């Protein structure tokens, strides 16, 4: 295939897609450029399904190469290692809008690899990677109902901005990524500064309208390349088997889905399918395959649950479509942590813990754009016991990283600036029970644990997950969805925010045909649920605690002369090391002279502060100091008046009478009162005990005398 190149103006940038030159052995490969950001995206599919495969094995790997930004990795091996959080989140961002567009029953393995080859610090590579994935899949001929477009939307001065730069995003009230086909929105991921539902919906529709030119460009590219589609057809369904399975299971499944408790419902459904498998002799030469029966079973379960809701009956757990499950809240549940909260909503429960730290505890991130640190962290963990299962426990999976990032987005808008609250903060959400919307429970629990720790949040933040059931023109929006409703429904729509507006929104749609009106209904219904949860949270913990935990570090901040920093550090760090060890504190000094002391004991903190102030203080001529004799000389003594500030006390300045032997009047380690008589250009001090004694007498005789 000869090289083909297409370009358009996309926002302020030039977007270019090229194919036919690089990675020609991949089934589909494109180079996507947005100004100086360049991404290679490839798509490869296995033309045969593995025996017994009963799910769609799609893998998306997004990789950021350090050479793309002219950098060498900072690790010991000097090469890229395991995926960073940014790479994991972008891989999920690419995966979510394309996964629903592969046909049902397509179980062939597909792998998408997106490699960042050149990185412009002003243009994130995620949008080019999403566009490139769509183009590579279309060119590959793999069964795929695309193409998909993608856009980033900002909101500055009440105007939407298409594909804002990194600099623009710093002043934007919105950072929203939307992806969709020509007719439908499929995915939204955003964080916002308490924006209204109308502004958020407007951003989604604006982004969808703007991406149409990208979809047209991909179609033109595919037409010119002459794509050959795979010869793939879904397996024909055995209608007689469908009828048998329906007869054996439908009535019992309807009864099982009326059980409100998840564990009882799951057990009943498992028993039904075990009986059906036995009666149909699944897995034997006489019976059907397990995969065929499971596919029919999933469709049957979906039909039962969906029709029940659309027909106006109650949901699985007996609620109406707008009802939030019962909520209970406890805070301060753990005695030694800095802040904690237990948030329970129905059968979903999150134990959130907040830990306060110093600037030294901030997360250091080695990114393409350069090193930076984050003072607010949120980590989400969901062990297998949360769903009554066994499984691997250890490093977080992609899902856990994604859920943690969503909860973090929701809370970022209310975190106080460092000038108001100098601590770094880490929230960990331990999901101890899960039956739908554990990420939104993490938002609520995380907010409450921060307030329990004494973090002065701007407002309470609550999150809620919405669902959708749609058949033809009939649809129902569900508030606070269960796990089964998420699994069997058409949309997972998570909204978090304050009483004033939305701070985070995530939408994943499994079908095409979700209209603007449906999204509007979902947003307004989500607001109703969010305000209900916020009211309960406020009743439990109206404001943040006025004081932090006794187990949290105290922070003391002040400034010193930047030229004196080296005096505090000392040779080889000896002075500051001794300070931290002797006072039990942690001390950080910035280049501008800002000093931060973290301590558990306030006495230790004040002691460290005084010693630093003494080290950095300038000796004043004419002032009297309490000094320490460091060394005796034949002609006097060396006396320290401040840390690192020593002077000569001449023998003639020790006493009013003549002194023959210095040792008769002084000894090393003795504390003496001395007055600074002179400081020369090199900082050498001349001291006097006689003058100090005279000044003291004058002050005693005349209290109005203010001599130093």
From Swiss-Prot:
This is Polyribonucleotide nucleotidyltransferase. The lineage of its organism: Bacteria, Pseudomonadati, Pseudomonadota, Betaproteobacteria, Nitrosomonadales. PROSITE patterns: KH_TYPE_1, S1. Its EC number is 2.7.7.8. It catalyses: RNA(n+1) + phosphate = RNA(n) + a ribonucleoside 5'-diphosphate. It holds the Pfam family S1. Its main location: cytoplasm. GO terms for biological process: mRNA catabolic process; RNA processing. Its cofactor is Mg(2+). Residues 622-690 form the S1 motif domain. Residues 553-612 form the KH domain. Mg(2+) binds at residues 486, 492. Keywords: Cytoplasm, Magnesium, Metal-binding, Nucleotidyltransferase, RNA-binding, Transferase. The keyword Transmembrane does not apply. Involved in mRNA degradation. Catalyzes the phosphorolysis of single-stranded polyribonucleotides processively in the 3'- to 5'-direction. It is found in: Cytoplasm. Belongs to the polyribonucleotide nucleotidyltransferase family. HAMAP family: PNPase (MF_01595). PANTHER family: POLYRIBONUCLEOTIDE NUCLEOTIDYLTRANSFERASE (PTHR11252), POLYRIBONUCLEOTIDE NUCLEOTIDYLTRANSFERASE 1, MITOCHONDRIAL (PTHR11252:SF0). GO terms for cellular component: cytosol. GO terms for molecular function: 3'-5'-RNA exonuclease activity; magnesium ion binding; polyribonucleotide nucleotidyltransferase activity; RNA binding.
